[in-house]
C-alpha cells in the first residue's frame, strides 16, 4: 500500500499537481523542508531551522534546547534522541507537553506560524505551491515514533498557505 501511495504522489508531482517536500528536491520542495536553513525566532529563542526547533523539543534542559535550535540540516537531525518516545513527553522552555495532546499540536502550529510570518523565503516557497497538494512521502507516519508525522506536517503547511489557522 505504501508503494502505491508513493507512486501516486510521484505521478501527481510529475504532472504538477503536488509537491513532495524533501531537502534534496528542487524548489520549492527543498526550501519547505524542515532541514533547510530558514531562520526564525520563537519565545526569544533563535532557530536556524524548523528541524532544530523540532529536535530541541526532545530535551528538557533549556540550554540544550537553545543549542539544538541553533542547528540546521543534517546536524539538527543528527541531534535527535528517542528517549522521549517511552513517555511521549516533550519540552519547551519550562513547559512539559504530552506528544499526543492538543497542546502539542497547538504549540507546533504556533511555531510554524512564527516561522511563516518571519521568514520570507519559506513564506514565498509555501505560497508558490498554491493549488497543489503537499506531501512528504519519506516522512514517518507513527506519531509515537516521530516528533511530527507526514500528515501533521503537510496539514500545518496547507493550513498556513491557505489561511486556515
Question: Where is each model-derived feature located?
Answer:
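Charged, low-complexity intrinsically disordered segments
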Residues: 3-165
